[in-house]
Amino acid sequence: MSETATWQPSASIPNLLKRAAIMTEIRRFFADRGVLEVETPCMSQATVTDIHLFPFETRFVGPGHSQGMNLYLMTSPEYHMKRLLAAGCGPVFQLCRSFRNEEMGRHHNPEFTMLEWYRPHYDMYRLMNEVDDLLQQVLDCQPAESLSYQQAFQRHLEIDPLSADKTQLREAAAKLDLSNIADTEEDRDTLLQLLFTMGVEPHIGKEKPTFIYHFPASQASLAQISTEDHRVAERFEVYYKGIELANGFHELTDAREQQQRFEQDNRKRAARGLPQQPIDQNLLDALAAGLPDCSGVALGVDRLVMLALGAESLADVIAFTVDRA
């Protein structure tokens, strides 16, 4: 919308009314399917270890904590929701605030609304179908198409991301005029992400949503490794009209393997001069107690609303972006 006094909302009132209707529609979608809505904390004593995520940190000083207790604003409700799953809650969803101390712009705000849900006994593909159902209902769009990560690279960059070495990845980056970044980057996954962002994303999801699945095993995060091809993880992302909408996993249930991944993340953080993050022992204990076989997905609601309304920026669908907060 046009420039307004900063006390006023960035989004128009008609857009906020439409946003409210979409939130109601999302809740109805899950109620009709018997999925329980839950609420979990916005703060935790532990946080994500992913080298590409930057959480906000605060400090609690109160009874029993006179020396203070570090707390982190949640980048996603994932860890707490998995603890509920391990406790036997069944299928769950949540609409909540999440926080990331990163960029701000047309498609980013440090505080944003997340839709996250988990389906016991669903594999990755069944959950992808449910995500597709939700997108068609909210966006009135065509059914999505699906491409493996490998197929997407081969189609748009003519390179195999699962076998290419760093020299080949840098050569692909040079064709995109990205040598100034790629030539000094030693982390293979960062090179792959650079190529995906600049060489694949602009070409997918133009007319209909596109699922990209089977990311490299080195990018598994909290997903299982495929039993059919150990080079890839049971992980997917969804793109539509130039926007990343969602990220989903066939969830890892092995506590020991998850701890090893967290520790590996922290080693990568140390190598980059980033602070090592406290590992969530409660999550690991929940996995050890028995997380049911399940798949889960996190979807950016503000971006979904932006697409539904044909808006140009998140500022058009959020009442008060961070510069007006």
Swiss-Prot record:
Family in the record: Belongs to the class-II aminoacyl-tRNA synthetase family. EpmA subfamily.
Protein known as: Elongation factor P--(R)-beta-lysine ligase
Keyword ATP-binding: yes
Family matches, as HAMAP family: EF_P_modif_A
Annotated InterPro entries: Aa-tRNA-synt_II, aa-tRNA-synth_II, aa-tRNA-synth_II/BPL/LPL, EpmA, Lys-tRNA-synth_II_C
Annotated signal peptide: none
Disulphide bond pairs: none
High-level lineage: Bacteria, Pseudomonadati, Pseudomonadota, Gammaproteobacteria, Enterobacterales
